Amino acid sequence: NGRDIHLRGVLDCCVFPLTGYPSTDVEEWRRIFTTIRSYGMNHVRFHSWCPPEAAFTAADEVGMYLQAELPMWIKDVGQYPARRDFFEQEMYAVLEEYGNHPSFILMCNGNENEGDFAVLEDLVKKAQAHDGRRLYSASTARTHVPADQFYTSHVTEKGWITVYEGKPSTDWDRNETSAIDVPVIAHETGQRCMYPNFDEIKKYTGVVEARNMEVFRERLARHGMLHQADDFFRATGAHTVLQYKEVNESLLRSSKSGGFQLLGLQDFPGQGSAFVGILDAFWESKGLVTPEKFRESCAPTVLLAR
């Protein structure tokens, strides 16, 4: 529509510890998106899944851009024709069911796929022909194809997009690594773990039990250090907050950046014990940083020195 936008995004990795499945209640999704917006974000990437109708409705109301994906995170794309047909059917179903929602601006085939990218590009072209109201991409990370209308990745042919190297500096950006001719979004920026907050264990009253945190707590007690648990949590959490500030600001300084997708605002217990969030797995604050303070480095307008 001719309006420039810089996507300040987070991942939603389908983490629902109480139920094991996403809520179908608009009010719950309104709570989640309002929380995300309060930290300066305008965009949510659903990591290799598509949320229910309630999420799109809430996003329309709150004002949140969404990226839905097919349930594809595989190393051998194109090997099984029946599986490929399933993905195409799912693609059309998602577009038919949710395509009228204005919040639904991006769609991707899935996460870090490998294999036959001709198959992935064919899906992109079919989606574009079926419903041209949003932008499409073959895969989040790994390979850029000519049909891509945006590209999300760690790296291009010229180097890293995400901020995993170098020393903190106010003169540090990623302009030199954005040579692709479509908007480039930095993939899964952040990923800085902190020590667990053992006070969260009591929140796990549903289908998921926090047995990993129970093991960590028992080990710490066995070594006579349990009384230091909160110190470890707050010290490492403060470090993570500072690192995310550096990540966000470096990409905001990059005039060629299309945006970023932070991993994460929320913890990701779906793949090991990834305590990467300033919010816990329930989208609730850990008390490490206020939304107001976080927005100083993540907002439509951020004061930066170079």
Annotate the PLM regions.
Residues 1-36, 57:
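N-terminal carbohydrate-binding accessory modules
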Residues 23-26, 81, 85, 283-288:
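Short, conserved loop/turn and helix-capping segments at secondary-structure boundaries
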Residues 4-7, 104, 183, 300-302:
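A residue-level signal for beta-strand positions that form part of recognition/binding surfaces
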Residues 33-34, 43-279:
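Substrate-binding/catalytic cleft of secreted carbohydrate-active enzymes
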Residues 1, 35, 58, 126, ...:
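Residues within well-ordered alpha helices
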